[in-house]
Amino acid sequence: MKPISLPSRLCHSIQSWERVTRSQLDFMVHRFEKDPAYQFIDTKYDLIQQTNVTKTDPVRGRNTIYGWIQGRGLEALAGHAQWLASGNHPDDTKSVSRIKTDIRLLINRLDQRIAEQKCNLTFMMHEDGSKPALFGVERVAENCHFTDLFYSKGLAAAAALLEDSEQFERAKVLFDRVCDDILTDQFVSDQASLDPKNPVKPVPGRHGHGPRMIALGGLSLMLQITGDTRYCEIGFEMIEHIFKHYVHHSNRHDAISSLAQQLQVGDMWEFIDDKSEPWLEAGRVLRCDPGHAIEFTGLAMKFLHHCEQRNLLNSSQTTSAQQWRHTLCHMLQHHVQLGFSADGIGIYKAIDLIQRTPLHSDMPWWPLPETIRAAAFARRYCPAEEVDCYDAIMLK
């Protein structure tokens, strides 16, 4: 594995990012602690207006709790606590202690909701556990959902930080079940459609790459904690599946060849059908989410990095990892260029790969941190001139 060599200008930038991270982390911890009766991760804040969102807002208000955000919040708090514990900042020890206390409270709060609902967490719920009017897909008891995926990896990270073997085993059982459902096509998306331009509700015969992509983050985490080679094998199977069915390459010989004139090497589409062929909307639109493609490159490279850190790769996997990294680095650059708006405002949410044009004007915030993560991993393996480009992203 290549050693990290950072130019001085980037080291200075990283120090700035660390200050920003500490400030934002303190902000979120303070919001969690200021209302002991609430005890959920509180993201109900308008960064533009610098005001709290009205509680009665049916989508963004404090009375609408998102299971995804609570699970992801657990994972983020635990990960940042580990980062703080590895540093030498004078306030870090106190901050880690605060975060551990808050994590315990959050786990207890979520366990209370699980017990009251007599099922796992759901995509949306009110503070009292009742279902909002905008509630998404009804839980199917025998199927795992995205909320299970986010919560299981969040609980695993939190339990590892707290050295709580009982909670970790509980998280592991749920995460393993999620992976089994993904690999056997039993996984069901529970996301509610809050925007008609974002078609997230399940459609019979349509299959997205999202479950495998998000699972890669959990597999990286479980590898770090357990060193179990089984998670390495599952991750390789998931990456191979995505490359085979969702990414265009020059030697494809399946039904996608009929679209070859419109497609470019590295294009990644969102959905396939029951025959593993690209899902065309209205018979003519092949949807790409550049942010999701960028997210996949970052999560895949992070997974491969942790496999190497643990020395878990056999010779065949090492060869595949080297080949995949070349493709992933190309895909990162390709989708930043494909999705980036001409006026430099952001990355489009949806691109039609046939017409090579945006499907609408939405540009969400989250592709930016996904690009930063992917660039951080890609810079280890790319030519010098490309590393300069990645450094430029970090310096921005």
Where are the model-predicted features located?
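Glycan-recognition and catalytic cores of secretory/periplasmic carbohydrate-active enzymes
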Residues: 2-396
